[in-house]
Amino acid sequence: MTTEPLFFKPVFKERIWGGTALADFGYTIPSQRTGECWAFAAHQNGQSVVQNGMYKGFTLSELWEHHRHLFGQLEGDRFPLLTKILDADQDLSVQVHPNDEYANIHENGELGKTECWYIIDCQKDAEIIYGHNATTKEELTTMIERGEWDELLRRVKVKPGDFFYVPSGTVHAIGKGILALETQQNSDTTYRLYDYDRKDAEGKLRELHLKKSIEVIEVPSIPERHTVHHEQIEDLLTTTLIECAYFSVGKWNLSGSASLKQQKPFLLISVIEGEGRMISGEYVYPFKKGDHMLLPYGLGEFKLEGYAECIVSHL
């Protein structure tokens, strides 16, 4: 049992639509087209690494495989979540993700992908694509084949602080000028439906996955309803943004100090603004914007001090 938070070093991904905004978190980014920060990642395409304590140098996958007590002895062959920060300097492709059953059959045992977005920042008039207007699979197929994207896709204006739940089967895309934190199932399976006819670094059109997309898109497209809950704990305002079968995600606004107890199998904390410190036992752990902490099972009582905004997630 450990009574210390585990700080993780993220993995960065260059993307055709990425930019430089992730540098504002204090990160050293690999290029001017850095699109993704994989903050908590235990996937074959990216592994975040512990930066402190007795588990320093371990990947998240290694902790899950060999130190399951840190996660309350949860079952499963892989860590269940993946947390990212996305910098959309340009529009992301219009895409959809499969559910677990479809992905297991068609993607060699991969998980499906239900996700959610918290809008950290965005340009004025920024928008996302969130759902579609087709009423039947036949209409959906026809509109895709004809390239009737303006008629098919639903566009939604966004502002900082907005939150969107994106279940598998939902047509979606993050638009230009948006910085978002994404919590998702631990999957990297994406079916690209439309990519604005963009070309990659070699001058080739990026691959589309029309057949699979049409098979997994939910018709009709009905936005998921979710209820937001608030709780004040001393100087900490906690907001529950979503609770679903795959994860629970919330926001913490710290404006002073608060005493808490870690009672989940694990708790993931991403600091998106401000700074402070966590006190656990006799030890003090400073944190700042851009830090990502995993609070393991059994950590017990701890105290937060400072002024910060965090996105937190757990099962």
Curated annotation (Swiss-Prot):
Q: How is the cofactor bound?
A: Binds 1 zinc ion per subunit.
Mutant phenotype after disruption: Cells lacking this gene are unable to grow in minimal medium with mannose as the sole carbon source. They show impaired growth in rich medium, and impairment increases in the presence of greater than 1.4 mM mannose.
Which co-factors does it depend on? Zn(2+)
Question: SUPFAM superfamilies given for it?
Answer: RmlC-like cupins (SSF51182)
Residues forming the catalytic site: 192
Q: Looking at the record's lineage, which domain of life comes first?
A: Bacteria
Assigned keywords, A-Z: Isomerase, Metal-binding, Zinc
GO BP term, example:
carbohydrate metabolic process
What induces or represses expression of this protein, per its UniProt record?
Up-regulated by mannose. Is under the control of ManR. Is subject to carbon catabolite repression (CCR) by glucose. Forms part of an operon with manP and yjdF.
**Residues reported in the UniProt entry to bind Zn(2+):** 97, 115, 172
Instruction: Report which reactions are catalysed by this protein.
Output: D-mannose 6-phosphate = D-fructose 6-phosphate
**Record-level Gene Ontology MF annotations:** mannose-6-phosphate isomerase activity; zinc ion binding
Looking up CDD domains in the UniProt record yields: cupin_PMI_type_I_N_bac
- Report if keyword Metal-binding is assigned: yes
Stated EC number for the protein is: 5.3.1.8
Query: Matching InterPro entries, A to Z?
Result: Carb_Metab_Reg_Kinase/Isom, Man6P_Isoase-1, Man6P_isomerase_Firm_short, MPI_cupin_dom, PMI_typeI_cat, RmlC-like_jellyroll, RmlC_Cupin_sf
| Family label | Belongs to the mannose-6-phosphate isomerase type 1 family.
Q: What is this protein called?
A: Mannose-6-phosphate isomerase ManA
Native species: Bacillus subtilis (strain 168)
